[in-house]
Every structure is written in structure tokens, then in C-alpha cells.
Amino acid sequence: MKPVAPRSFFAMDFLEFITAWEGKWLSQRTNYSFEQNEAGNAKSDVTVQRWDSQTELGRSLLERAGLKNQGELILLQLSWDNSVDWGKSKQKGTIYYGFLPDADHGDRGQLWRGTTNSNLAFLRGDYHLGSDECLTLNLGDGETSLTERHWYASPNLRLRTSLIQQGEGYSHSAFYSDIRRLPPAE
């Protein structure tokens, strides 16, 4: 019997892929520190919201990222709260992603990630939505590089991995499963 190739759950373009990020998610993470030879796990509530790059927040982040007015910029706010993880120290935070699609290739473009905290550096890099329907983010600041891969197992289950490299070796890896709690507000 001839093996059957798995049916693609989604056939999304980049904008549809990013739009599917929006909403409230329960995120479960398993991570490993190569430097400390230590594994861990955590869970948190994650909220992803899209912002207009022309708002005051959008203009402020563009300025911090060193970008001029970019009409095609897609700006996402990702906030997390690990209060759902009983027995762990509580952490809340917010990070922003800015995606600037390539005019000739809509499945790739420039990327930056940062916060409104002026003491923390923005990471810059690129992204690519592959034919395997996996979004790869490559970010760095010179000595540290971060590679994240995001994909959907179903409309309400997003999976992702991250790998941090410092110098010649890897320092940290993580696997996340994100279960949608609420779709984005209409």
C-alpha cells in the first residue's frame, strides 16, 4: 500500500499566519539550559494583539527600532503572565514583534523584536514562511542569535521551538505548545 502524505492543515500566506497568532493562549514550555545542564518547564497565559504602526505606541517602537515610517509594518504585542503556574515565582512581561514584508516576496522580510524599555536592546533579523508552513524567525544582536520556528497543528494548537546560540555554542533550547483560549476580538 502506498503511504499517504499528510494533508496540510492550513494553506496560509504570511498575513493569515500572523493573524492566526492573535488571541489568548495557554502556553506550556519545556526548556533546557546547556550552560547549566538543567531542564525546566513552565506555563503561562499569553495574549497576542495586533497594533497599528501609526499609533503613538507604534511610532515610539519604530523610532526605538531605528525604522522610518513603514506603512506595511505588522506590529504584534505579545504579553505573558505565568500566574497560572502554581508554585512558581510570578512573572509578567510584554514584548513587541515588528514584521516588514519584502515587497517582492510576501513570505519573507525583515524582523525586529523588543520592548518599550529603553535599557534593553532590540534584536533584528529576518523571517521566512516556508513551504512546510513553518514560520522561521532569525534574530540577533552580534554575539547572540535566536532562531524560533512556529507552526500550527490545528487552528487552536500552535507549536514553537527556540534555540539560542552564544558565541560558538548553544546556550538554551525550548519547546512550546500553545492552546488557544480565546480567538482575537472582532
Swiss-Prot record:
Higher taxonomy: Bacteria, Bacillati, Cyanobacteriota, Cyanophyceae, Synechococcales
EC code(s) of this entry: 4.-.-.-
CDD domains: lipocalin_CpcS-CpeS (cd19433)
Keyword Ubl conjugation appears in the UniProt entry: no
Family: Belongs to the CpcS/CpeS biliprotein lyase family.
Keyword Lyase set for record: yes
General function of this protein: Covalently attaches a chromophore to Cys residue(s) of phycobiliproteins.
Keywords: Lyase
Enzyme category, top tier: lyase
Protein name: Chromophore lyase CpcS/CpeS 1
Residue ranges that the Swiss-Prot or TrEMBL entry lists as coiled coil: none
Pfam families: CpeS (PF09367)
Gene3D superfamilies, alphabetized: 2.40.128.20
HAMAP family, per database record: Chrphore_lyase_CpxS (MF_01459)
GO MF term (any one): lyase activity
